[in-house]
Amino acid sequence: MTPQPLADNLSPPDPARLAQSIKDWGRELGFQQVGISDVELGEHEAHLQRWLEAGYHGEMDYMAAHGSKRSRPAELVPGTLRVISLRMDYLPGDTRMAQVLATPEKAYVSRYALGRDYHKLIRKRLQQLAERIQAEVGPFGFRAFVDSAPVLEKAIAEQAGLGWIGKNTLVLNRKAGSYFFLGELFVDMPLPVDPAMDSEHCGRCSACLDICPTAAFVGPYRLDARRCISYLTIEYKGAIPLELRPLIGNRVFGCDDCQIVCPWNRFARPTGQGDFQPRHSLDNAELAELFLWSEEEFLGRTEGSPLRRAGYERWLRNLAVGLGNAPSTIPVLEALKARRGFPSELVREHVEWALRRHGET
């Protein structure tokens, strides 16, 4: 269903009962947790502004766009009174995270990206939830978001009681860790709000800050995206800085290190969503094998996958860095040499860097 523009609507009968029903319906649709937030995000707006002014967003210009709308839901979607925040876990049953990271000839893909793209799946579930609400109360104004618009989803999740923003800047949940996606439904109904998570439970722990391969955390709760492997391998379009390439290791799409070491993730549970299970053995693939994919193979095997966001050229760029950090084996060297004449200058430069790492000129 196409989202309707928000409109004035009478208060629904028995808001508390409706709020509980919304949470029940959300769980029936596969969400593990549902909370309701108001539209005041308080200090989060100032925190975002300081982060932007420091330049920590790198080339993610969209983070600075839209002005105050990002931190003010009622300005982004006029008429919004509440935000329904929902959590869906994504961790596969057999993660192989430590195993793959410890095997330098393997390609490490962030575990959220191993299955189908979460955007479409969660957006569809949000639409279904809106339809269920509409069947109960009649027409109402709503708009669904899944990491695809200027929404401070982590701040909203904290306000809705889904967890707290940890030192690694991710939302943490005492019963579920941090391996989950977030979705939001902006609504024009004055539903009762849930208690905000106004305390954090990281304590003295600094495991996430200490483990970061590229020292991307400038302090607790402060991430410099320009040094973050997830940013460099997914969002960044240029040549990866030379000084960071050896630190990236075999991480070719995203990074999970600050989640892997988080003590709260011992409570993370495997997802029940089949769509989030690994496809094409990407949880245990060889760097050299992936590097030899043609563009047609890349497009075919990443159809409906988050990996499409990088595109073929940056996919090869990332793999070249991984191969440069891999052992000097015959398959590694042959794969790199096969790409020496690749049309993209970006790819060629990373290939030559990788070959020099192996003593090849």
Swiss-Prot record:
Residues 193-222 form the 4Fe-4S ferredoxin-type domain. Pathway: tRNA modification; tRNA-queuosine biosynthesis. GO terms for biological process: queuosine biosynthetic process; tRNA modification. Pfam families: Fer4_16 (PF13484), QueG_DUF1730 (PF08331). PROSITE patterns: 4FE4S_FER_1 (PS00198), 4FE4S_FER_2 (PS51379). Binds 2 [4Fe-4S] clusters per monomer. GO terms for molecular function: 4 iron, 4 sulfur cluster binding; epoxyqueuosine reductase activity; metal ion binding. It is found in: Cytoplasm. Its EC number is 1.17.99.6. Its cofactor is cob(II)alamin; [4Fe-4S] cluster. Keywords: 4Fe-4S, Cytoplasm, Iron, Iron-sulfur, Metal-binding, Oxidoreductase, Queuosine biosynthesis, tRNA processing. It catalyses: epoxyqueuosine(34) in tRNA + AH2 = queuosine(34) in tRNA + A + H2O. SUPFAM superfamilies: alpha-helical ferredoxin (SSF46548). The active site is at residue 147. One of its GO terms (cellular component) is cytoplasm. Belongs to the QueG family. HAMAP family: QueG. PANTHER family: EPOXYQUEUOSINE REDUCTASE. This is Epoxyqueuosine reductase. It comes from Pseudomonas aeruginosa (strain ATCC 15692 / DSM 22644 / CIP 104116 / JCM 14847 / LMG 12228 / 1C / PRS 101 / PAO1).
